[in-house]
């Protein structure tokens, strides 16, 4: 057939590729061989059972070629050449060749498959031949989007199972192992056969059995696969699964659409099958034709009646609607407001947008139905339809035209009324806008003009208020035009009969009345401001005059008060007399001051009178000064009171200075006697201390006589102390009548006593030294004369340089080298052991007597201790206690250091160190 030839031409190359693939791969896996054998056997039996036969062993039952030819006839629907009935090998080969030739005639190129292998029972070749047949007659006709049969079948499976979870078909081996893909294919086409929601990917055996059982029972697809083989085989045989899945494809494709496959059913078989139906039902055909003719006539008549009834109904409804609408369109009543007209316009637009379009469609449908009805009646030889009176097409058309004219007139009226009312509304809005602006401007103006705020102002603030009022007057004049415009707009609204003229007129009247009040209040405030300015200017002049006079007068008062209460300090009669004279001159000026005070007070009284008369708050505050009349009055009163107090103070001070003058004279008279006496006595004592006259005993006698005379003069000092105490109590610090002060006299008196005592002590020490050292009076006088010669200042002491010069003058040799300096420093350490920096006469005399007389030395004492110690270098405490008195023995034991030399015994004392320490030759 032509389609078969087309398929042969289109798919020939594909078959060759499949056969070559078969030859290359072979059946190396026993599991795959088992699956293919079982699947192919089931597939063959699914077709052979239609011929009333089956096979048990695929490699044995096809060896004679008879069932092979029968299988091809069943699946192709064609008749093959008559088979040979012999049982010889060549008969079998001939039958198999007939089958193979038939396959080749379908465009399938068989490669490496010969009749001999089939006859010999070669399982591999037999399965390959069956797979070729399956490809040609079961899979080849599967075509999806111009893909190969295998790819098309795979794509078909993917599309059908796409909506199902846990199903992802990518191939024909692993993707079908869990059985969900088989169940999904069945459920997609027959959801009534499987409850897919109860299936689980974890139970593949149950899924496979469910799919195979349902397919065999309800879809007439034989059980070609074994679930255990699919589960236990790592990679199931692809060809076995493809063969089985192709049965699903054909089963569901056939259920959806007959003849949709690529290979069409045999034409002769279909014609033969249909002719049987024709002969079966040919007797009932005439009766059916007659019944159909009657039904057709009745149906046309019923349709015509339906159209007539519908026309009547539509015509009545449309005319009734027009009748109800016309009064509304002809109405010209409105509330004379833009909102009311706009509401009517919106109602009209709603009518045109919502209500009329359905009626237009109704009218068009009415005319269409009428024309259709007349045409059908004419074609069916029926009389023309005549509507009831008043419902003809012309009646409806006339009513419709009247409606459209009414609509046009109504719309024109609405637009004209809208324009008129918009004009009125614009004027009303303009009136409102100007009135609002005017009222905003006037808000608070009356209160401002009626305000008495200027009564609280000072002059500068009042002038600012006046300037502000002048600006307001200018602004008021400028607003005159606005008020006139408001009145003109209100007049126009009245002329055009605005619907709310009452409120417009009332508002306009309020504005005009308020404008008149503002004018009157403005003039009244102007007058009040001028009067207030005049009064405040007068007060300001008085304040300024007060400030000019009060400031210098206040300064004079402050200065005067300070002078009157000034705590003056005077020490002489001349000073107090000068103060009294100045105070008398000041009192002479009080008359003029009293006049100035009265003038200042009168200025304040005048201000107070004006403020009280006009009740001006804060008018008494003077902006030019902080001084007040009360300040002036208080200070002037203080001055008047302080003047007599100052008189009394000056009088008291005068009496005090007179008494002080008397005390000065009294102290001076006594001090001028005591001071020279002390000086004379001091000179006499100093002369005696120089030791140049008489013996030491004579000097001592004379000093003691002076001592008695000085103590006898002490009452004069005590009397002078009493006078001095009175002077101090009177705070007298200067005395021009004497050069002596109590301090100088007291110091002189104390120095006199000290000098007498010191000289007595020195003379007594000199006598003791002379007697103990055995020096003569001449030597002593010589030492005194030398000491006094170098004591230039008569201080009774020599500096180191003076002492050195004195030694040289007495014949003492002191070198000028370093050794001489060391010797002199040793001598200074003897005569000035306390390092005071001076050498007194006693130390000088002691040094000179030691140098000039035979005195005891450290060596002499050491020799004495050596005798007591029996020539030992140390001495024991018992030896000291035995030879010396107890007190002197204990004195030596306590002060002698322990002996640290050789051959010492416990308790031994170092008498050598002790002896040298006694004479200052080493540290003890």
Swiss-Prot record:
Coiled coil: none
GO molecular function, one term: actin binding
Calponin-homology (CH) domain: residues covered: 34-138, 147-253
Location of the region described as Actin-binding in the Swiss-Prot/TrEMBL record: 1-250
Family matches, as SMART domains: CH, EFh, efhand_Ca_insen, SPEC
Spectrin repeats: 251-395, 396-510, 511-631, 632-744
GO cellular component terms listed in the entry, alphabetical order: cell junction; cell projection; cortical actin cytoskeleton; focal adhesion; plasma membrane; Z disc
UniProt-annotated binding residues for Ca(2+): 791, 793, 795, 797, 802
UniProt GO BP: actin cytoskeleton organization; actin filament bundle assembly; muscle cell development; sarcomere organization
Tissues in which the UniProt entry reports expression: Larval muscle isoform is expressed in the larval body wall, adult muscles of the head and abdomen and supercontractile muscles of the larva and adult. Adult muscle isoform accumulates within adult fibrillar and tubular muscles.
SS bonds (residue pairs): none
Localization per Swiss-Prot or TrEMBL: Cytoplasm, Myofibril, Sarcomere, Z line
The keyword Translocase is annotated on this UniProt entry: no
Gene3D superfamilies associated with the record: 1.20.58.60, Calponin-like domain (1.10.418.10), EF-hand (1.10.238.10)
Primary site of residence: cytoplasm
Keywords, alphabetical: Actin-binding, Calcium, Cytoplasm, Metal-binding, Repeat
Subunit structure as annotated in this protein's UniProt entry: Homodimer; antiparallel. Interacts with Smn; the interaction occurs in adult thoracic tissues.
PANTHER family documented for this protein: SPECTRIN/FILAMIN RELATED CYTOSKELETAL PROTEIN (PTHR11915)
Role of this protein: F-actin cross-linking protein which is thought to anchor actin to a variety of intracellular structures. This is a bundling protein.
UniProt protein name: Alpha-actinin, sarcomeric
UniProt organism field: Drosophila melanogaster (Fruit fly)
Gene name linked to the record: Actn
